Amino acid sequence: MKISRQAYADMFGPTVGDKVRLADTELWIEVEKDFTTYGEEVKFGGGKVIRDGMGQGQLLAADVVDTLITNALIIDHWGIVKADVGIKNGRIAAIGKAGNPDIQPDVTIAVGAATEVIAGEGMILTAGGVDTHIHFICPQQIEEALMSGVTTMIGGGTGPATGTNATTVTPGPWHMARMLQASDSFPMNIGFTGKGNVSLPGPLIEQVKAGAIGLKLHEDWGTTPAAIDNCLSVADEYDVQVAIHTDTLNESGFVETTLAAFKNRTIHTYHTEGAGGGHAPDIIKACGSPNVLPSSTNPTRPFTRNTIDEHLDMLMVCHHLDPSIAEDVAFAESRIRRETIAAEDILHDLGAFSMLSSDSQAMGRVGEVIMRTWQTADKMKKQRGPLPQDGPGNDNFRAKRYIAKYTINPAITHGISHEVGSIEVGKWADLVLWRPAFFGVKPTLILKGGAIAASLMGDANASIPTPQPVHYRPMFASFGSSLHATSLTFISQAAFDAGVPETLGLKKQIGVVKGCRTVQKKDLIHNDYLPDIEVDPQTYQVKADGVLLWCEPADVLPMAQRYFLF
């Protein structure tokens, strides 16, 4: 018996050779592989396959998955494939073909009475986003981020303090302890960065031992060559990452001075274009160094006709500047350059900028990391055409390049890729389901550690789950001890060895960062291009390997107003 390709897609979702449009963009992905055995697909529902003696077998709980996502279209850095995904004990247990091995062939994921089912037919499945530029200004950010599809937040802060409004720093052991304790309340993987701006090792070491998973160098605290050198030395000793916001005013040196202070050691450069801060006008040069792991923040993503205007006011507020002081205004204006922002679009498309993050409430929007990543990808396809690596009629490589920017690459950079950042067996089951029409904008379901933490949900008093008003609501994995079992608090190995979780009474699962100091740009997947960057000091024009980088600002973006009418 045969059915039409359209009927098959309607029933089980797209299969090999089918193409799917991502939201209202011009990006199209094509299914590369389908793990199913045609005719043996499993699907739940009345009169469907996953019933006792059919697709569901008789095995005990130990031998079947806890949760099965059926027939989902996976988009990840490693591929665009159709598969069943099995989850066991909060981790991804299998990617393959589900069913009853007693009666079905080629089953790699056993289904039993202990198995819950989530229908993935016609849905896109991605790893939860990893946002590594968080100012922890208010706890409400965490819900905003979760509902956008972000499941890991890394950064610093203590609340709406003036220092936190400007810098991603949780300074000192006392503040670190309070923030670690607070993080127990949220269905989000969280890691904190300490203050890196000091010229002697002691104050840095005590922060790492208190739980910091990294150290942040910020110009507002004084990012001098001495502070950079000291911070990187401590990071090398304790295997934590260093993030840097460089010296916009070039007071203690120019970009060449800062790059020399790195001494070829690994460092994560925040908003490497410079509008978010950094050596004016040429911090963008840093993306050509093999030891530099470059990221963007989302307000400049992508370059539009409104980008310049909104940035000036943003900057004055976030960095405690006074519009009545001429020097403060000049400082702000030096950071906002059309030419370098336009170049940033293209450098992302070339894979020279490797990551994208938010800069939450401090010149960035915490709920728009994923959306702005795909808006940038769409703008670049429209302006630059298909990438050479893309197949005929699809944007698969571009999709893999861009999804890596907010999933696997930030996870690799901060030493947590053994736990999160991709859909791979053994990793924490932080997964996001999307309807293709709403991809990147509004997820349908967010899983944390294999349990549903948030979802679109209709009227709770209705007779079915779907009546309006439909909006995002926290689900059971956001409450009680389930929250502690399904989310991670990341700390340093030194803090783990010192017994910090026990001392502070932390209840969430503990993740330990590792491998931070050996990462090089060549390790950042699909985003490892090392261009030779030149910036004209008069015109701010940017060239990469001798080629001028310029693109027009967008007047209209996809994934925008038509999705936010209410």
UniProtKB/Swiss-Prot annotation:
User: Kind of enzyme, top EC level?
Assistant: hydrolase
The GO cellular component terms are: cytoplasm
Copy the pathway line from the protein's UniProt record. Nitrogen metabolism; urea degradation; CO(2) and NH(3) from urea (urease route): step 1/1
Domain named Urease is located at 128-566
Q: Which CDD domains match?
A: Urease_alpha
EC number(s) on file? 3.5.1.5
Where does the chain cross the membrane? none
Q: Under which name does UniProt file this protein?
A: Urease subunit alpha
Q: Which organism is it from?
A: Pseudomonas syringae pv. tomato (strain ATCC BAA-871 / DC3000)
